[in-house]
């Protein structure tokens, strides 16, 4: 699949997730089979660009793979400015967020709250496309609620505005992440536009990935929450799509190596104070299916020092293997 002039190495894309798809996580997913990774959402409000954490996350020069940066907001000019800023800092693709259902985003009329206002959507899309000379993509949902699904209209509008690919989550804004994603809307959008369509929502296994691709006719898949604590899911899905067979479960030693490497990367990226705190949620995701890990997770979450976190993880896996 191509987005503009960029050829993805496969059909599997890491979904942008606030507080999750930072540089260490994106690099890890790319290493384990993802064809592209989209950065976590960046606000179009320049006042929020000044924190050290934001500045650190905004620099994309030197990253592996195709660098896609997601921006969010409701003011067309601020969105255009954010797109230009991102390109100046290494973005090769700009992704516009109109899919996030979070209240703190929606109350600012950003994310999926915009689905009620196609006129504003059109202004934003045109402003961003005109502001940069890189491909612009859009991530959105099927509609405001189940009675107001307007994804076909939004998809056609996006295509007319110059959007070069569309990622569609199979839920409405009102659904948040409840219930199950539906794929009929994605199938209908794929049939309605000629730009690439990327299916998103509940793609949590190789078999589900194959089903969604075949049912919707989508050009690619976007995977978010199922990759938390399992970044190798992209490798598993790619193998299944190519060969029709499932890979064996990763040996515990390889899981240990991946997790320790990820935690070390977080420590190095965020520093001695913030790194261990961010590592906690990732370790929780890695160990969520380990029945014996509940007590360890509580202990681990109380550890503030980077070196002590690594020692604790070594000890945990030594006990599991013994």
From Swiss-Prot:
EC number: 1.3.1.-
InterPro entries per record: Aldolase_TIM (IPR013785), DUS-like_FMN-bd (IPR035587), DUS_fam (IPR001269), DusB (IPR032887), DusB-like (IPR004652), tRNA-dHydroUridine_Synthase_C (IPR024036), tRNA_hU_synthase_CS (IPR018517)
Binding site for FMN: 16-18, 70, 139, 200-202, 224-225
Cofactor section: FMN
Molecular-function GO terms, alphabetical: flavin adenine dinucleotide binding; FMN binding; tRNA binding; tRNA dihydrouridine synthase activity
Keywords in alphabetical order: Flavoprotein, FMN, NADP, Oxidoreductase, RNA-binding, tRNA processing, tRNA-binding
Protein name: tRNA-dihydrouridine synthase B
Designated gene of the protein: dusB
